[in-house]
Design a protein with these regions (language model features):
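Conserved PLP-enzyme active-site core in the AAT-like
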Residues: 25
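Active-site-proximal beta-alpha core segment in soluble small-molecule metabolic enzymes
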Residues: 2, 6-10, 14-17, 29-120
Length: 123
Protein backbone atom coordinates (compact mmCIF):
# COMPACT_ATOMS: atom_id res chain seq x y z
CA UNK A 1 0.00 0.00 0.00
CA UNK A 2 1.29 3.45 -0.89
CA UNK A 3 1.44 6.09 1.80
CA UNK A 4 0.42 9.52 0.49
CA UNK A 5 1.53 12.29 2.79
CA UNK A 6 0.41 15.77 1.88
CA UNK A 7 1.60 19.08 3.20
CA UNK A 8 -0.32 22.30 2.75
CA UNK A 9 1.52 25.57 3.14
CA UNK A 10 -0.36 28.84 3.14
CA UNK A 11 1.41 32.13 2.67
CA UNK A 12 -0.46 34.60 4.86
CA UNK A 13 0.82 37.53 2.78
CA UNK A 14 -0.83 35.98 -0.28
CA UNK A 15 -4.01 35.45 1.72
CA UNK A 16 -3.95 39.13 2.68
CA UNK A 17 -3.35 40.14 -0.95
CA UNK A 18 -6.27 38.00 -2.12
CA UNK A 19 -8.58 39.47 0.51
CA UNK A 20 -7.65 43.03 -0.44
CA UNK A 21 -8.15 42.25 -4.12
CA UNK A 22 -11.58 40.66 -3.59
CA UNK A 23 -12.62 43.36 -1.16
CA UNK A 24 -11.72 45.97 -3.76
CA UNK A 25 -13.87 44.23 -6.36
CA UNK A 26 -16.79 44.27 -3.94
CA UNK A 27 -16.38 47.99 -3.32
CA UNK A 28 -19.96 48.69 -2.17
CA UNK A 29 -20.46 45.37 -0.42
CA UNK A 30 -19.13 43.81 2.73
CA UNK A 31 -16.40 41.28 2.11
CA UNK A 32 -16.18 38.57 4.77
CA UNK A 33 -13.94 35.60 5.52
CA UNK A 34 -15.11 32.09 6.37
CA UNK A 35 -12.64 30.68 8.88
CA UNK A 36 -14.62 27.75 10.29
CA UNK A 37 -13.04 24.49 11.41
CA UNK A 38 -9.79 26.10 12.55
CA UNK A 39 -9.65 28.03 9.27
CA UNK A 40 -9.89 24.72 7.43
CA UNK A 41 -7.00 23.38 9.49
CA UNK A 42 -4.71 26.36 8.89
CA UNK A 43 -4.96 27.85 12.38
CA UNK A 44 -7.91 30.11 13.01
CA UNK A 45 -6.11 32.73 15.08
CA UNK A 46 -3.22 33.08 12.62
CA UNK A 47 -5.60 33.44 9.68
CA UNK A 48 -7.86 35.77 11.67
CA UNK A 49 -4.92 38.02 12.62
CA UNK A 50 -3.64 38.17 9.04
CA UNK A 51 -7.04 39.14 7.65
CA UNK A 52 -7.83 41.58 10.45
CA UNK A 53 -4.58 43.42 9.69
CA UNK A 54 -5.87 44.14 6.17
CA UNK A 55 -9.24 45.46 7.40
CA UNK A 56 -11.37 42.33 7.28
CA UNK A 57 -14.00 42.87 9.97
CA UNK A 58 -16.60 40.20 9.16
CA UNK A 59 -15.87 36.54 9.92
CA UNK A 60 -17.98 33.39 9.61
CA UNK A 61 -17.35 30.41 11.88
CA UNK A 62 -19.24 27.14 12.33
CA UNK A 63 -19.80 27.03 16.08
CA UNK A 64 -20.35 29.27 19.06
CA UNK A 65 -17.15 27.88 20.58
CA UNK A 66 -15.13 29.05 17.56
CA UNK A 67 -16.76 32.47 17.85
CA UNK A 68 -15.83 32.74 21.52
CA UNK A 69 -12.22 31.81 20.76
CA UNK A 70 -11.97 34.66 18.27
CA UNK A 71 -13.92 37.07 20.47
CA UNK A 72 -11.32 36.64 23.23
CA UNK A 73 -8.70 37.82 20.76
CA UNK A 74 -10.53 40.77 19.23
CA UNK A 75 -13.57 42.60 20.49
CA UNK A 76 -14.34 44.68 17.39
CA UNK A 77 -14.81 42.01 14.71
CA UNK A 78 -18.27 40.97 13.51
CA UNK A 79 -18.48 37.23 14.10
CA UNK A 80 -21.28 35.16 12.56
CA UNK A 81 -22.09 31.57 13.62
CA UNK A 82 -23.18 29.43 10.67
CA UNK A 83 -24.72 26.73 12.87
CA UNK A 84 -27.28 29.23 14.11
CA UNK A 85 -28.72 29.06 17.59
CA UNK A 86 -26.87 25.93 18.63
CA UNK A 87 -26.14 27.11 22.14
CA UNK A 88 -28.47 26.24 25.00
CA UNK A 89 -27.53 29.58 26.51
CA UNK A 90 -28.86 32.05 23.95
CA UNK A 91 -27.77 35.05 26.01
CA UNK A 92 -24.17 34.14 25.09
CA UNK A 93 -24.78 35.71 21.66
CA UNK A 94 -25.74 39.07 23.14
CA UNK A 95 -23.15 38.99 25.92
CA UNK A 96 -20.27 38.37 23.49
CA UNK A 97 -21.75 40.26 20.51
CA UNK A 98 -21.87 37.15 18.33
CA UNK A 99 -24.35 36.99 15.46
CA UNK A 100 -26.17 33.70 14.80
CA UNK A 101 -27.17 32.85 11.24
CA UNK A 102 -30.84 31.88 11.24
CA UNK A 103 -31.16 28.72 9.18
CA UNK A 104 -34.87 27.97 9.26
CA UNK A 105 -38.27 29.42 10.12
CA UNK A 106 -38.17 27.85 13.57
CA UNK A 107 -35.03 29.82 14.46
CA UNK A 108 -36.54 33.00 12.98
CA UNK A 109 -39.65 32.67 15.11
CA UNK A 110 -37.57 31.91 18.18
CA UNK A 111 -35.48 35.05 17.65
CA UNK A 112 -38.57 37.20 17.19
CA UNK A 113 -39.72 36.13 20.65
CA UNK A 114 -36.27 36.38 22.29
CA UNK A 115 -34.43 39.19 20.49
CA UNK A 116 -33.67 41.02 23.74
CA UNK A 117 -31.67 38.00 24.96
CA UNK A 118 -29.97 37.32 21.63
CA UNK A 119 -29.15 40.82 20.41
CA UNK A 120 -28.60 40.58 16.66
CA UNK A 121 -29.21 37.85 14.11
CA UNK A 122 -28.55 37.35 10.41
CA UNK A 123 -31.14 35.82 8.09
Amino acid sequence: MTNHNSILEVNLKNLQYNYKKLSGLANRSICAATIKSDAYGLGVLDVFDALYKVSCRHFFVATTQEALEIRKKRSTANIYVLNGLESNNISIFNKHEIIPILNDIKECNFVLKNIAKIGRAHV
